[in-house]
Amino acid sequence: MPHFRSNGLDMFYELHGQGEPMLLVHGFSGTGQDHWQHQIPVFSERYRLIAPDVRGHGRTDHPETITGPPFFELATSDLVGLVSSLGLGPVHVCGFSMGSSLATCLYYARPSLVKSLVLVSGAARINREVGGGLFELWQRLGNPDAISPGWAKRLAALHGEQRWQVLLQNYSRAVIARFSQDEAILYRDAGEIRCPTLIVQGGRDLVSPTVLSEELHASIPDSELVILDCEHWVPGLRPQEFNEVVLDFLDRHFPAENPL
């Protein structure tokens, strides 16, 4: 299985299919295979997929603590290095939840590497006004004893019995640090995005409320917003609709990549 050495850790990734490159960035507590399980078989028929496990997740190394640059900066640097090392850029970038934040951070860090953005179940900003309940949730998740036995079992299966608690604690600290910033904005430069951008949102999402995707849509010039009837994990809850929406978006903006 391929690994890429980045910022002192070994980053696991998978490659699937042939065609124009597409980077799939999973969300918190998932893996590339887990969160994109319904997309990889379909998208790989037309695209060269890069599906990494973000630092601290799955088969990528789990740092014991987050030191130096914050989590999002390190994870973004990992993705820039991975795409550059494979020589596959520019890439279409599809990010879910936390992965949508990393997708936009990748654009800000290296816009020449990004051909298009698909931002799924993300948020234009995170603050106490809109997401106060989420802030309290992430504070509680810093204590692994606060989560349900069912989720603990799932995390152990995905990330290892000895590593999932470190994952929770690290990401909890990273999110709380973001909340603590004065501007508390993940997509602080959304108005500067100039590549084709699709935003996909679950209409019943309580993790990232619809109003936040609407704000993001209003901030990104010429972006498109599609709201599907489901909760947070849109790629898994509405896989057929989601796949059709994404492929239609790419076909319209890049018709030469998939000539009929």
Model features per residue range: what roles?
Residues G203-S208, H232-W233:
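Acidic catalytic loop of the alpha/beta-hydrolase fold
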